[in-house]
């Protein structure tokens, strides 16, 4: 593989384990949601996102109903922007009081640092909100890695399974899509990125995917088990 001009990476299942997100972050946000909404519900930023949830429901509903809706969305792993924003705010409180640190695979931390040192700009695109992404990298168990990242993208730029989202990102960072390498563990996301001309690599970590995906599903995407196998 030739050296890309920029690298765009997912987080969950790519730089970090799926189990940390599913077993630590999601349950933490679910448990904390009622108290957080009741305590901070009048804060303009929090109320903005709660209003978006109410708009989605299509009713003028009390906060208790919004809380139940948000907890249901967490159970369903909904990629709703308002949910992701509120989760990020709650996780911010958790990081602040050191309830947990964010999991980062050692190979990912080392390779991101090496690419940054080599002058390759790094970008993050995750369904989690941009503030949550920044907190994740700032409070990782490999230390503060947030300074390695040039810019961050979430679902406000569009769905991760739509090619238009990747075109917008390429335009935002000012690099031709063909010179951007996108890293993800989700084949549908890689398919969308490839339709724009981006280079792609599927992360298939044995910790997250004990059974390899079929060659037919993987298609033309490069398949690697960790970041150290990405050589250019």
Swiss-Prot record:
Known EC number: 3.1.3.77
Pathway(s) where this gene product acts: Amino-acid biosynthesis; L-methionine biosynthesis via salvage pathway; L-methionine from S-methyl-5-thio-alpha-D-ribose 1-phosphate: step 3/6; Amino-acid biosynthesis; L-methionine biosynthesis via salvage pathway; L-methionine from S-methyl-5-thio-alpha-D-ribose 1-phosphate: step 4/6
Record keyword rRNA processing present: no
Requisite cofactors: Mg(2+)
One Gene Ontology biological process: L-methionine salvage from methylthioadenosine
Xref: InterPro entries: Enolase-ppase_E1, HAD-like_sf, HAD-SF_hydro_IA, HAD_sf
Source domain of life: Bacteria
Gene3D superfamilies xrefs: 1.10.720.60, HAD superfamily/HAD-like
GO molecular function: 2,3-diketo-5-methylthiopentyl-1-phosphate enolase activity; 2-hydroxy-3-keto-5-methylthiopentenyl-1-phosphate phosphatase activity; acireductone synthase activity; magnesium ion binding
Cofactor note as given: Binds 1 Mg(2+) ion per subunit.
Reactions mediated catalytically: 5-methylsulfanyl-2,3-dioxopentyl phosphate + H2O = 1,2-dihydroxy-5-(methylsulfanyl)pent-1-en-3-one + phosphate
Family: Belongs to the HAD-like hydrolase superfamily. MasA/MtnC family.
Subunit (UniProt): Monomer.
Cited PANTHER family: ENOLASE-PHOSPHATASE E1
Function: Bifunctional enzyme that catalyzes the enolization of 2,3-diketo-5-methylthiopentyl-1-phosphate (DK-MTP-1-P) into the intermediate 2-hydroxy-3-keto-5-methylthiopentenyl-1-phosphate (HK-MTPenyl-1-P), which is then dephosphorylated to form the acireductone 1,2-dihydroxy-3-keto-5-methylthiopentene (DHK-MTPene).
Family annotation (NCBIfam families): enolase-ppase, HAD-SF-IA-v1
Protein name: Enolase-phosphatase E1
Lineage: Bacteria, Pseudomonadati, Pseudomonadota, Gammaproteobacteria, Lysobacterales
């Amino acid at each position: 593989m030739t050296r890309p001009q920029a690298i765009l990476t997912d987080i969950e299942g790519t730089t970090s384990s799926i189990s940390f997100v599913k077993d630590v972050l999601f349950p933490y946000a679910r448990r904390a949601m009622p108290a957080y909404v009741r305590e901070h519900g009048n804060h303009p930023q929090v109320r903005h996102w709660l209003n978006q949830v109410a708009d989605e429901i299509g009713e003028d509903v009390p906060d208790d109903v919004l809380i139940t809706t948000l907890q249901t969305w967490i159970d369903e792993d909904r990629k709703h922007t308002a949910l992701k924003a509120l989760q990020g705010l709650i996780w911010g409180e958790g990081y602040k009081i050191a309830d947990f640190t964010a999991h980062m695979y050692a190979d990912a931390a080392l390779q991101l640092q090496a690419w940054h040192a080599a002058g390759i700009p790094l970008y993050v695109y995750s369904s989690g909100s941009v503030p949550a992404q920044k907190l994740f990298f700032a409070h990782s168990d490999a230390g503060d890695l947030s300074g390695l990242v040039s810019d961050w993208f979430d679902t406000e730029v569009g769905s991760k399974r739509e090619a238009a989202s990747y075109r917008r990102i390429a335009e935002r960072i000012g690099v031709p899509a063909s010179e951007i390498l996108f890293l993800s563990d989700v084949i549908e996301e890689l398919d969308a990125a490839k339709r724009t001309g981006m280079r792609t690599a599927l992360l298939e970590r044995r910790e997250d995917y004990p059974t390899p995906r079929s060659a037919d599903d993987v298609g033309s995407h490069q398949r690697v088990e960790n970041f150290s196998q990405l050589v250019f």
